[in-house]
Amino acid sequence: MSQRSRQTPSDAGGRGVLEPTGLPVAAPTPTARRVVVIGAGVAGLTAAHELAERGFEVTVYERKALGGKSRSFPVPNSASGERRELPGEHGHRFVPGFYQHLPDTMTRIPSLDDHRSVWDHMVPQARFLYARSDGREDLPVLSHIKGVATREFLRRASEALLRHFKALPPAQLVTFLTRLLVFMTSSEERRFGEWEYITWWDFVRAERMSEENRRLLVNAVTEHLIAARGDLASARSIGTLAEASIYALTRLSTTGESGRVLDAPTSESWIDPWVAYLRSKGVRFVVGVGAQAFEIGRGRISAVRVTGPTVNQRVEADWYVCAVPVERAQMLLTADVLTADPSLACLAQLRTEWMNGIQFHLRQPLPLFDGPVNYVDSPWGLVSASQAQWWNRDLQAGYGDGTVRECLSVNIANFDAPGIVYGKPACKCAPDEIAIEVLAQMRAALEDTGRIMLSDGVVASWFLDPALRFENGVMSNDEPLFVNYTGSWDVRPTATTAIPNLFLAGDYVRENLSAATMEGANQTGRLAANGVLEASGSVASPSRVFLPYDPPALAAFKRRDADRFRRGLPHVLDRI
């Protein structure tokens, strides 16, 4: 196995810059401080943040809107009087307790309306709900008891757990828990050398499970929460997120809660303050203009051509951070770029899937649960959040036409499975069919015991992510999501490239979690910034890069497993 394929996230970051072979390379000058960042999602804004704080002159080019997939945006023609337009979004934002890089950045962004930080405006989440269909008991999950658990909640949770576990074949549950233990006690060598190359489905022995077990133990983690397919994604990538979630839920490694949500629509609470702070540091933003091609000269990027409705020009800088999503980065790999760094051809092998959202604006408050709701049995892998309960503003008084009191935001993780109303996958449905289908799938879980939760009259309007375009009977997606598959770590790039002044940032770049997350995007933005610092000869301190939580109690098991892996032996518990 190559050294590249065995690099871990901590190796991949570094501050070293690979030199290209066979090409003359111009050396940087001591005053080379100009940086162009292409893309203003979390990765690009993070790189701009870290570099601007260290005295670099940063210009950010963004083809659509600041914030990328993480932004919120106004619903067109939804306001009346002095109110704002209703909030829409690509998908609701949730910051799990095991995130480290993103919370650190949020603590360094001043809010716009007080003397606190953006992080101070995050609302703790201590529980979530597995909503079941066909009369099965919903399963509330509590990460910790202090301050949030009522006697009624504990009674319901205990009864639901007992019913669910009675329905699960004990042998299958033991197998699943054993497989989790195998992963959590596996060495880094085995994770990257063995578990990277088998699917999560095969790793947990999903083919031996009942359909009920697969829904609860496999699909609920993969499709519903991270838009990954258990039969395609590697055991290493899914296992990494699974163990991180376990450590957060048990408070072994957490920022204080199992997760947090914002106290207002995302851009108002986070993206707008972030952009304002970056502007105060001298960052310049050019919106509506995207990169078309990099130009190469003497082994370095000499310019990037950017275009927009009224713009078509070359932009020169000393350093370039490409922070666009992988499907956009692939378009920038011209023959000249690949000649300068042939390893970047691997980007063509990376894949994307669809995970987009729809918001239902309701006439009545509908706090279904004071945390995310995972519709385990929904074929489209739905997860919802009733957001008005967490926002520090009056939705009815401040937004829309004065009748909307709730924003029920729903993420759709599976666009390929047939629905329950039209029998078609989401990617084949018209927007109104998607809205009807999503409501039906939620009602199948929320109203399966006879109670009415989502009556027809309560829905004032709905808004589908505008990245989904339905034209001439065909759906397209302008903002798909990077997904892992077995062996994809080997073809994921590092933040530093063999082109000395080109750096990559985005959730497809190697990082700790190995999944499409805001945390991973933030980490790669830091890694790209550190690459610029190293290559420019800057004496500024590097951006902090955190290591994943590694329980000391498991260290001896992992050392033993590393020795067994080097000798070609299986994990000591890998007998099931």
What function would you assign to each model-found segment?
Residues 1-35, 53-54, 552-576:
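Extreme N-terminal leader/targeting segments of oxidoreductases
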Residues 32-60:
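N-terminal Rossmann-like FAD-binding beta1-loop-alpha1 element of flavoenzymes
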Residues 251-262, 305, 317-319, 324-492, ...:
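C-terminal segments that line or cap access tunnels to active or ligand-binding sites in enzymes
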Residues 31, 310-319:
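Core beta-strand elements of the Rossmann-like FAD/NAD(P) dinucleotide-binding domain
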Residues 173-298:
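Active-site/ligand-binding neighborhood in enzyme catalytic cores
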Residues 294-314:
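Conserved beta-strand-loop-beta-strand element in the redox core of flavoprotein oxidoreductases
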Residues 52-78:
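Glycine-rich FAD pyrophosphate-binding loop
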Residues 80-176:
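Dinucleotide-binding Rossmann-like beta1-alpha1 core, especially the glycine-rich loop
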